[in-house]
């Protein structure tokens, strides 16, 4: 089976200290990979490099067979990303935020409304469409972050601490 993500000899240094060194792994289509480790182990650094938020010091990341250093724009089209602290805009409604996220992903304007509805349903936040983000609980703000990561129907999703503020029994109801 062809991998959707392949990481080869990935390393990153912040000034003097190495955050990660010589990491290798693959994620196959329909596969799941969890990065586990203590605080400061390099989990977020690895995810940020895969998603193109941070440049690696050494090594190569392939997304759907594309070397991200050679064609990062094409590679990023395949990725949905929820950072550890997603940038939420408190004065926007849920619908406005998800529409903006879809527009930033250069989605066909004719498909955005339906994509927003699907993402809200998959994350169980459809009933908050017109609510301001500031008025959502931390758990629902996290679900909104997940919805923005999947609104453009990416080939794979990278979620950094996705169950933050979630009730244990409700985590299983997310359709991501």
Task: Outline where the language-model segments fall.
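Conserved ABC ATPase "signature" region
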Residues: 99, 103, 110-128
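Conserved catalytic motifs of ABC-family nucleotide-binding domains
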Residues: 153
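Conserved ABC ATPase signature
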Residues: 132-136
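Conserved ABC transporter NBD signature motif
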Residues: 59-67, 74-75
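Hydrophobic anchor residue at the start of the ABC signature
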Residues: 146
């Amino acid at each position: 089976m062809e991998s959707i993500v392949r990481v080869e000899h990935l390393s990153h240094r912040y000034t003097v200290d190495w955050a990660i060194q010589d990491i290798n792994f693959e994620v196959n289509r329909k596969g799941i990979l969890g990065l586990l480790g203590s605080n400061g182990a390099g989990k977020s650094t690895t995810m940020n490099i895969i998603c193109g938020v941070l440049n690696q010091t050494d090594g190569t990341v392939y997304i759907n067979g594309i070397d991200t250093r050679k064609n990062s724009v094409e590679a990023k089209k395949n990725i949905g990303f929820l950072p550890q602290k997603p940038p939420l805009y408190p004065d926007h409604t849920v619908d406005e935020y998800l529409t903006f996220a879809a527009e930033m992903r250069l989605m066909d304007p004719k498909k955005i409304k339906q994509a927003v509805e699907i993402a809200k349903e998959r994350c169980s936040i459809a009933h908050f469409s017109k609510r301001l983000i500031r008025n959502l609980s931390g758990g629902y703000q996290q679900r909104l972050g997940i919805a923005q990561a999947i609104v453009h129907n990416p080939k794979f999703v990278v979620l950094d601490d996705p169950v933050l503020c979630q009730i244990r029994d409700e985590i299983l109801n997310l359709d991501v």
